[in-house]
Amino acid sequence: MQISLKRLLPFLIILSFALSLHAQETVKILRVVDGDTLKINYKGKQESIRLIGIDTPESRVNPRAKRESQRTGEDMKTILAMGKEATQFVNTLVKSGDKVSIELDIEKRDRNGRLLGYVYLSNGKMLNEEIVKSGYANLLTIPPNIKYQDRLVRAYREARGNNRGLWK
């Protein structure tokens, strides 16, 4: 049975497109900005990457921290302390110079121009999921970037159920 190249070519094109949609790329960590944002070297440029699906407390006074304080009823000092704790936790998982893999989802950038992605540590674990599982982040689901929503929900329930991190 011989398959002609003409018949095989469309299949190969579709396959390569499908594989590239969620391809991982290796990047270097430059620094941890806060609990859900990193600076990375991406394609030769310094870029910010916002971790998809998670939201850690703010670690600096800004309008978002004020809204968070109003929404939760926590004072600003508590919000900032929780944000710093989340950032410190992320710093235990990634350091400047570390090589990690990133996977972008459907929407590649947010309105601030930051990359939106899932970050994989050298041990293969997803950083986004590890932060949630350890209790240092809430869930933040923004369609269409929902590829790993179920994993993150399970991690969140596990953290809350076991009083981990900020849920102590």
Please annotate each region the language model reported.
Residues 2-11, 19-168:
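Small beta-barrel nucleic-acid-binding modules, primarily SNase/OB-fold domains
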